[in-house]
């Protein structure tokens, strides 16, 4: 498998950056995971979007799906791209209806060479963590979540964990919609994952502090950045 980070900001992109978007490749299968602002340009620099096997949207917040709207124009006359997304919010899902082969993420099991395992997580709108497996390798993406029952077990022994790490210790609270870097690292350690990449950085947050706090728990933690490529 290969993961390419296209964007890693939220809820809006920093100068020169992009919101959540990741390209996962396994053999001939290519899946775009989330499609926030700036993601489409980064994707198009690497491949034609019509070469995608599917798009998987962890949830329907703008910073994870806004570039689906210009993608509608890019895909005109090129067939309906399969898009897996939660069923709600209905008004957000409705923006995609008709333009794509829209499918329920809740029931997704296979995309090409990839087998999917979906877990509902804790966020203000329905959001799903997804584990992708192919040829004995596994990749886990938390989507957006705070602490969540079952998340550590879901990520157990994966080869690469891409985890929401929006907050420093000082910023995090139990009632907020995202994990801290330290909590993401603790989950990675307890799950026995082989590699951890932190993502979903708010512009202006000290990413060095995020990495420092994560590495106190999981010393090999990495920060996502546009253009980062990892093979596993």
List each model region and its residues.
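Active-site metal-binding loops of divalent metal-dependent hydrolases
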Residues: 8-9, 35-38, 60, 121-123, ...
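Metallo-beta-lactamase
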Residues: 80-127, 134-136
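Active-site metal-binding motif and surrounding structural segment of the metallo-beta-lactamase
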Residues: 38-82, 159
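Cap/insert and terminal regions of metallo-dependent hydrolase folds
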Residues: 148-229
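Short, solvent-exposed loop/turn segments at secondary-structure boundaries
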Residues: 16, 97-98, 172-177
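Divalent metal-coordination and catalytic microenvironments
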Residues: 3, 22, 34, 43, ...
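Conserved beta-strand hairpin/beta-sheet module of binuclear metal-dependent hydrolase folds
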Residues: 1-47, 128-143, 160
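Short, surface-exposed connector motifs at secondary-structure boundaries
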Residues: 27, 52, 75-79, 135-137, ...
